[in-house]
Structures are given as structure tokens and as C-alpha cells.
Amino acid sequence: MIRTNEIQDLLVCDRLRDLEFSWVDGARVELPYRELLCHDHDMTSTLSRFHGGEVLLEIFEEREEPACYLREVLLRVGAKPVEYGLIRIFLENFPEELRSLIVAGKQPLGAILNESGLGYASRPGGFLKIPGETFKPDFFPPSGGGFLFGRYNQLIGSDQKVLARIIEILPREKP
């Protein structure tokens, strides 16, 4: 996969602007990251099951643009960071009652969608392999020279409209 406009539009925040990564086939994503990334359901419930707790949302930056709401986030279970992401949410494709919940920033989008019962599908568009020495945010534990893995994902509503486009990056897990 190449850097399309959809992906390039997500690499706008300072942490991702110069992100070095390569696209890899899902079968080449290391375990346990393959189990966490290579599926067609939401990350919130996947991370909650894997880490054994409620996933909490921390927003680093957010802004509303004419056609969407963009936010840079960290998901945590307790104090442990479990995912860093940048998400472009197309609010006009959501029912009005969900828009205010999304913009309130109290819950991850996956939790809001699952609690609402709104029909949607997760469609990963590719998997990222990121050299740990080039992406070292202070909120992730050191990678120990290993690679980090992530994915480019789209959430598609039951009406086939794009609900969100997301870059999701996972920290290294301790062996």
C-alpha cells in the first residue's frame, strides 16, 4: 500500500508528520500485535479484552474542520498506554445524538458505537511496521529496539458511509 491522500491527511500532527513506516502483510505482524490489529472489529473492545480493563480516552489535540472532527488520542487501561492514534471522524455521518457524545471526548469512539448499537464495520486498509528507534513518544514505554505495529483503519456505517479513518499504533508489550 502506498501513502494515499486519505492516509497523508491523517499524518498531520507533529508526532506523525515524519513517521517512518513500511506496509506489511497482516501475516507478518508479530504476535501479540497481530491478534490486536488484524481483525475487522473495533479496537476499544479488543484492547479491553486483551488488557483486562476499561479503555479510557486521553485527548492530546482536537479540532473541528469543515467536513470532520480530528483528534489525536492516547487510549489507556488504568495508567498503562495501550494505543496511540489519530482519528478523523465524519460527524455528518452519525446520528445527532451521537455527535455530542463524540465531541464531548469522554469515551473512545468504539465504546460510543458499541453502546449505541449503531451498525458499523471495521475495515483495515493496511498494517504498519514502525522502527521503534524512530517513533519514541514519551507516553510509550521504550521499545527496546523492536518494531512497533499499527494499522490504517476505516469505520464504515451500515449505509456504507465512512464514519472514521484512523491510524492506530500500539506500544511494545513486555515479553
Question: Where on the chain are the PLM-derived regions?
Answer:
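Composition-driven recognition of glycine/serine/threonine/acidic- and proline-rich low-complexity segments
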Residues: 1-175
